[in-house]
Amino acid sequence: MNLVMEKTFEQYEKLFSMEEQKREDVFRYTMMRPFEKMWTAIQVPLKAKEPNGYDVIMAAKMLGYLDVRDAESGQKALQILKESHVSETAESALRQCIFFAEREQLRVNAKEIKFGLYIADPNKLQLQKGYCGFGGIPGFIHVWINPNSYNLPRIPSIIAHEFHHNVRFSYIDFHHGSVSVGDYLVIEGLAESFARELFGTERLGPWVTRFDHEDLQYSIDVINEVLDVKGFSEVSRYMFGDPIANDQGFKPAGLSAFAGYAVGYHAVQSFMNQHHITISEATRLDAKTIISQCGLFST
């Protein structure tokens, strides 16, 4: 499988040296053009038809990418990323993922994987400890990060998580209207379990590790009642928890941030441990099998 590492650090250096009014088009047409197919798949045009309309600039800001007008924050983050050799770390992690997938005969429905590493807004990803990713369209992976001592060592893990989405979505279809809570639990639980398989428990993300036993059990009890609830906006209430639900206009469900991610991870881990199944085997299974046989839910 071919790997294309977009040279985003070089692109950022040029972008931050430009006049402010020119930066958005450089971000749009130079940095995001290689990922146009990815953005189109999630209904985000590179350029809105109307002034100030919804497009890749607006979507990126909403998702927590750095506003390209903020050169001061961007240059500071870029310096840390370069000094930390993050490009090399990212490429090494991706090649480990590809090697594992090919060895286990797990497929990605794409001729190549394009990877882009971007700078995150220093204020918008506090719940995620300053880093995030997207791998929902096979062939494309984005990670955006405001580098700090917590997230820099976890870059391989989030890359593995997003890579697994590329794999999983090569085996199943994802439809916003019909996805259920149970489906989404398994998608995220498998991805974080894959990250654990490759890079260990110590690099798991805060969406899994911040839960103590009491909060986790409460989240399991709440989610147990809604496993068959469908539709992305409804499902998001349970996956992302109240802080993000409030921020994005969803009705809160009484859950901590990323409750569904934590429950999904523990459901997949329980299933794999009880049935002595590897992550590669679990990846090929349907969500209903994992949910009904994980032992966490009274289905």
Swiss-Prot record:
<protein>
    <recommendedName>
        <fullName>Uncharacterized protein YjfC</fullName>
    </recommendedName>
</protein>
<dbReference type="InterPro" id="IPR018728">
    <property type="entry name" value="DUF2268"/>
</dbReference>
<dbReference type="Pfam" id="PF10026">
    <property type="entry name" value="DUF2268"/>
</dbReference>
